Curated annotation (Swiss-Prot):
Part of the small subunit (SSU) processome, composed of more than 70 proteins and the RNA chaperone small nucleolar RNA (snoRNA) U3. It comes from Homo sapiens. Part of the small subunit (SSU) processome, first precursor of the small eukaryotic ribosomal subunit. During the assembly of the SSU processome in the nucleolus, many ribosome biogenesis factors, an RNA chaperone and ribosomal proteins associate with the nascent pre-rRNA and work in concert to generate RNA folding, modifications, rearrangements and cleavage as well as targeted degradation of pre-ribosomal RNA by the RNA exosome. Involved in nucleolar processing of pre-18S ribosomal RNA. It is found in: Nucleus, Nucleolus. GO terms for cellular component: chromosome; nucleolus; nucleoplasm; Pwp2p-containing subcomplex of 90S preribosome; small-subunit processome. This is U3 small nucleolar RNA-associated protein 6 homolog. GO terms for biological process: maturation of SSU-rRNA from tricistronic rRNA transcript (SSU-rRNA, 5.8S rRNA, LSU-rRNA); ribosomal small subunit biogenesis.
C-alpha cells in the first residue's frame, strides 16, 4: 500500500513543481499539500474503505482547484492549465469512479460527480457519467430528466435528449413528469428550429435541412407525445399541465386549441376542468378595438372578466354540484377578494360576489370547515366584521364541535365589541369537549383582562382550572401566575402560587417564574427563594440537573445566601438524579468549579 501511495504522490510532483515554478504557491505550501495529499491517499487506499474519506479527498482537490483559479486571476497568469488543472481534474474523476463503483446506490454521490463534471470536466466525460448513473438508477425518472435537459440545454443535442426520454419511457411508461418534460423539450426544439430558419431567411441563405419541415416546425412531434400521453395518463390535472406548457410557446396556437377542446370534451366531470376554463376568462382580452386607459375603465374591464369567470363557475356548480366544485368557486372568489385594488367599485363587487357564493354553498352544506375559517379570517383581516361574523356563525352551526371555529367566532365578536361575549364563551364550552377548550379559556382570560375587572378575570381563571385537567392545566397555571403578577404585583402572585402549589401537574417554569418575581423585589427574601427551589426540586429534582445547579449558584451569589449549604445540595442532587441527568450534573458542577460555567 505504501508503494501505491508513494507512486500516486510522485504522479503529483510535475503539477506541484509547475505551481511553485510559476509562483502560484510557495515551497512551504507545496510541502503542506504533499503532506495533506499523503494522508488523504492513505485513507482511500487502505483495506477498509469509508465513503467520507473519498468525499473529503474530492473536497480537498476542489478547494485546491478553486484556490489555483483565484491566484491565477490575482497574478494574471493563464498558462500551463494542461499540466496543472487538467491533471487534478483527471485525478478527481478517478476517485469519483472508484467511489461510485463501490457505493453504486448512493444517488447523492452520483449527483456530486455530475456537479463536478459540469464545472470542471468535458461534456464528453459528463455524458459518460450520466450513462453510467442511469444504468444503475434507471428506476429514478428525475435522473433521466436531468440527463435529457443537460443534453438539450448544454450540449444542444435535441436528438440525444429525445433518445434519453424514449429510453426513460420504456422504464416508466406511466410517469406524468417524464411525458411533461419530453413534451416541453419537443416544443423547445421546434421553437429553436423556427428561430434558426428565421435567421437564415433574414440572411437570404438557402439551407436545405430536413429538420425545417413544416410538420416539425409546427410542433408535430410534441402533438404525437400529447396524443400518446393522454391515452395512457388519465385525468384533468395532467391534461391541464400539458396545456400550461403549450401556452408558453406562441407558435403552438393550434396545439393549444386542440388540448383545450379535448380537456372540455373528455373531463367535464372533473372540477379542475371547470376551474381552468373559468380562470381562462381572466386572460381573454376585450373584443373592443380600444383598450381601457383610465384606472376606472381598467377596473370596469377587470370586473367584466371576473363576471365572465363567475358565469362559467355558475354553470359548473349546476352541472357538477359537489363540494370540490364549490371549493374551486369559493377559492376563486376569495383570491379575487384579497387581490389588491384601488377601485372601490371593484372591491365592493368582489365582496358582494364572495358573500353571495358563500351563502349559496352554505345553504347546500357543501363547504369544508377549512373554507369557513379561511373566508372568515380574510374578511376579518380587511375589517369586514359583519360579514366575518356571518361566516363564523354559519361555521359554528355546522361544526359545533370545532374549537378553532368557536375561537374564530369569538375573535370576531371581540373585534366587534359585542356585549354578549362572556355568555358566548359559556355557550362554546357547552358544545366542545374539554380537551379542546384550552385556547378558548386563554382567550376569555385575555379578553377579560382588558375589558373586565380584576375579580372577573380571576373568576375566569378559577373556572378554567376546574374545567381543564392534565397537561393543559400546566399552561393555564403559568398564565394565571403571569396575570397575577401583572395585575396585583408580587403579593398577588405569591397568593396565587400558594393556592396552586398542591394542584399538580406543574412545569419547571411555574417555579422559576416565582423565583424571578422574588428576585425582582427590592427586599428580596432568600428564605422565599429557597422555598421555591425546594418545591421545584420536590417535583423535578430527579431529572432536572439545571435546577440543582441554579440552586447552588443562588446560595453562592445571593447577598443573603449560605455557601456552606452547597455541599449538602450537591449530595442531595447526587442521590436524586438518575442516569444521564446525574452525569450532566457532575460535568456542569466540575465546569463551575473551574470557572468555565
Amino acid at each position: 500500500m505504501a508503494e501505491i501511495i508513494q507512486e500516486r504522490i510522485e504522479d503529483r510532483l510535475p503539477e506541484l513543481e509547475q505551481l511553485e515554478r510559476i509562483g502560484l504557491f510557495s515551497h512551504a505550501e507545496i510541502k503542506a499539500i504533499i503532506k495533506k495529499a499523503s494522508d488523504l491517499e492513505y485513507k482511500i487506499q487502505r483495506r477498509t474503505l469509508f465513503k467520507e474519506d473519498f468525499i473529503n479527498y474530492v473536497q480537498y482537490e476542489i478547494n485546491l482547484l478553486e484556490l489555483i483559479q483565484r491566484r491565477r486571476t490575482r497574478i494574471g497568469y493563464s498558462f500551463k492549465k494542461d499540466e496543472i488543472e487538467n491533471s487534478i481534474v483527471h485525478r478527481v474523476q478517478g476517485v469519483f469512479q472508484r467511489a461510485s463503483a463501490k457505493w453504486k446506490d448512493d444517488v447523492q454521490l452520483w449527483l456530486s460527480y455530475v456537479a463536478f463534471c459540469k464545472k470542471w470536466a468535458t461534456k464528453t466525460r459528463l455524458s459518460k457519467v450520466f450513462s453510467a448513473m442511469l444504468a444503475i438508477h434507471s428506476n429514478k425518472p428525475a435522473l433521466w430528466i436531468m440527463a435529457a435537459k443537460w443534453e438539450m440545454e448544454d450540449r444542444l443535442s435535441s436528438e440525444s435528449a429525445r433518445q434519453l426520454f424514449l429510453r426513460a419511457l420504456r422504464f416508466h411508461p406511466e410517469c406524468p413528469k417524464l411525458y411533461k418534460e419530453y413534451f416541453r423539450m419537443e416544443l423547445m426544439h421546434a421553437e429553436k428550429l423556427r428561430k434558426e430558419k428565421e435567421e437564415f431567411e433574414k440572411a437570404s441563405m438557402d439551407v436545405e435541412n430536413p429538420d425545417y419541415s413544416e410538420e416539425i416546425l409546427k410542433g408535430e412531434l410534441a402533438w404525437i407525445i400529447y396524443k400518446n400521453s393522454v391515452s395512457i395518463i388519465k385525468g384533468a390535472e395532467f391534461h391541464v399541465s400539458l396545456l400550461s406548457i403549450a401556452q408558453l410557446f406562441d407558435f403552438a396556437k393550434d396545439l393549444q386549441k386542440e388540448i383545450y377542446d379535448d380537456l372540455q370534451a373528455l373531463h367535464t366531470d372533473d372540477p379542475l376542468t371547470w376551474d381552468y376554463v373559468a380562470r381562462r376568462e381572466l386572460e381573454i382580452e376585450s373584443q373592443t378595438e380600444e383598450q381601457p386607459t383610465t384606472k376606472q375603465a381598467k377596473a370596469v374591464e377587470v370586473g367584466r372578466k371576473e363576471e365572465r369567470c363567475c358565469a362559467v363557475y355558475e354553470e359548473a356548480v349546476k352541472t357538477l354540484p359537489t363540494e370540490a366544485m364549490w371549493k374551486c368557486y369559493i377559492t376563486f372568489c376569495l383570491e379575487r377578494f384579497t387581490k389588491k385594488s384601488n377601485s372601490g367599485f371593484l372591491r365592493g363587487k368582489r365582496l358582494e360576489r364572495t358573500m353571495t357564493v358563500f351563502r349559496k354553498a352554505h345553504e347546500l352544506k357543501l363547504l369544508s370547515e377549512c373554507q369557513y375559517k379561511q373566508l372568515s379570517v380574510s374578511l376579518l383581516c380587511y375589517n369586514f366584521l359583519r360579514e366575518a361574523l356571518e361566516v363564523a356563525v354559519a361555521g359554528t352551526e355546522l361544526f359545533r364541535d370545532s374549537g378553532t371555529m368557536w375561537q374564530l367566532k369569538l375573535q370576531v365578536l371581540i373585534e366587534s365589541k359585542s356585549p354578549d361575549i362572556a355568555m358566548l364563551f359559556e355557550e362554546a364550552f357547552v358544545h366542545l369537549k374539554p380537551q379542546v377548550c384550552l385556547p378558548l379559556w386563554i382567550s376569555w382570560a385575555e379578553w377579560s383582562e382588558g375589558a373586565k375587572s380584576q375579580e372577573d378575570t380571576e373568576a375566569v381563571f378559577k373556572k378554567a382550572l376546574l374545567a381543564v385537567i392534565g397537561a393543559d392545566s400546566v399552561t393555564l397555571k403559568n398564565k394565571y401566575l403571569d396575570w397575577a403578577y401583572r395585575s396585583g404585583g408580587y403579593k398577588k402572585a405569591r397568593a396565587v402560587f400558594k393556592s396552586l402549589q398542591e394542584s399538580r401537574p406543574f412545569s419547571v417554569d411555574f417555579f422559576r417564574k416565582m423565583i424571578q418575581f422574588e428576585k425582582e423585589q427590592e427586599s428580596c427574601n432568600m428564605a422565599n427563594i429557597r422555598e421555591y427551589y425546594e418545591r421545584a426540586l420536590r417535583e423535578f429534582g430527579s431529572a432536572d440537573s439545571d435546577l440543582w445547579m441554579d440552586y447552588m449558584k443562588e446560595e453562592l451569589n445571593h447577598p443573603l445566601g449560605r455557601p456552606e449549604n452547597c455541599g449538602q445540595i450537591y449530595w442531595r442532587a447526587m442521590k436524586m438524579l438518575q442516569g444521564e441527568s446525574a452525569e450532566a450534573f457532575v460535568a456542569k458542577h466540575a465546569m463551575h468549579q473551574t470557572g468555565h460555567l
